[in-house]
C-alpha cells in the first residue's frame, strides 16, 4: 500500500448512543467537534467566496485541506438529509446524499447541518462531487453482481475508500485479489478475507464488509491485468498438486 497525502482526524461513523454502548464516547466526541468545526468552515468559505452571483471554484480547497474529503462529505450529506424537504437542493445532490449512511441522531445532526443559503450550498456540493470524481477512485458503479450473494474466491475486489485513510486513496491501493477465508462466502459467520494487493503484492486480511464489491472486468486497469494473470497462473499450478495429495 502506498501513501499519497496527509492524514486527517478520524471520522467516527456511529451515533453518540452507539458510541456509549461501545464504550467509545471520547472518540465520538472528538469526531463530533471536528464535524461542527468543518460545518463552520464551510459556512465561512461560502460566505467569503460568493459574490452575489457566483461561488468561486477554489472555495472548496481550504476546507478539504483542513478537514479532508471524508469529513466534508459527512457534513454535506448530513445537511442534505436533514433538509431533504428543501426544493432548492438539486435532485441529483439529494440522491447523492441519500446514498451515504448517516446514523440517526437528531440533536447532534442538527448541529452539523450547514446553515448557508441552500441554493448557494447546492453549488458547493457540486464542487465537492466534482473534486471527488477527479480522484478517480473505484466505487459501487464499477462493480458487478449482487454483493449479498457473491462468492469472492479468485475475484478482484474493490476496497472501500471508507476503509482506507485518505493518504492511501488511489486505485492502486483499492484492488485486491481474494484467495480464501470465511468472508469469501456471503453466508458464513466469519468475515475475514485473505487477499493480496494487485499493485504491490502485499498480503493481508480485510473483512468482507470493507469491500465495495467485485470489480467489473471492463474497469480493470492494464497494470492490474498482469498481476492478476500471474496470481491465476500460480493458483492453477498449485491446485493440481493439491488434488494429487488428496488421492
Regions inferred by a protein language model and the residue ranges of each:
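Gram-negative host-targeted secretion-system effectors, predominantly Type III and Type IV
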Residues: 1-246
Amino acid at each position: 500500500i502506498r501513501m499519497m497525502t496527509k492524514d486527517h482526524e478520524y471520522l467516527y461513523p456511529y451515533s453518540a448512543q452507539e458510541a456509549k454502548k461501545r464504550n467509545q464516547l471520547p472518540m465520538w466526541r472528538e469526531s463530533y467537534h471536528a464535524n461542527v468545526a468543518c460545518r463552520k468552515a464551510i459556512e465561512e468559505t461560502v460566505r467569503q467566496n460568493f459574490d452575489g452571483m457566483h461561488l468561486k471554484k477554489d472555495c472548496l480547497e481550504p476546507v478539504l485541506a483542513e478537514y479532508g474529503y471524508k469529513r466534508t462529505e459527512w457534513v454535506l450529506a448530513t445537511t442534505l438529509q436533514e433538509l431533504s424537504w428543501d426544493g432548492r437542493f438539486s435532485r441529483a445532490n439529494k440522491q447523492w446524499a441519500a446514498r451515504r449512511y448517516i446514523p440517526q441522531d437528531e440533536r447532534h445532526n442538527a448541529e452539523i447541518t450547514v446553515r448557508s443559503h441552500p441554493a448557494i450550498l447546492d453549488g458547493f456540493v457540486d464542487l465537492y462531487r466534482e473534486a471527488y470524481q477527479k480522484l478517480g477512485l473505484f466505487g459501487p458503479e464499477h462493480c458487478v453482481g449482487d454483493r449479498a450473494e457473491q462468492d469472492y474466491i479468485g475475484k478482484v475486489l474493490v476496497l472501500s475508500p471508507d476503509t482506507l485513510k485518505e493518504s492511501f486513496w488511489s486505485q492502486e491501493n483499492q484492488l485486491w485479489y481474494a484467495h480464501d477465508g470465511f468472508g469469501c462466502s456471503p453466508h458464513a459467520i466469519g468475515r475475514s478475507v485473505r487477499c493480496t494487493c494487485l499493485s504491490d503484492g502485499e498480503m493481508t486480511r480485510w473483512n468482507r464488509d470493507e469491500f465495495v464489491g467485485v470489480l467489473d472486468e471492463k474497469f480493470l486497469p492494464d497494470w492490474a491485468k498482469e498481476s492478476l494473470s500471474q496470481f491465476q497462473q500460480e493458483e492453477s499450478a498449485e491446485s493440481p498438486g493439491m488434488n494429487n495429495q488428496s488421492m
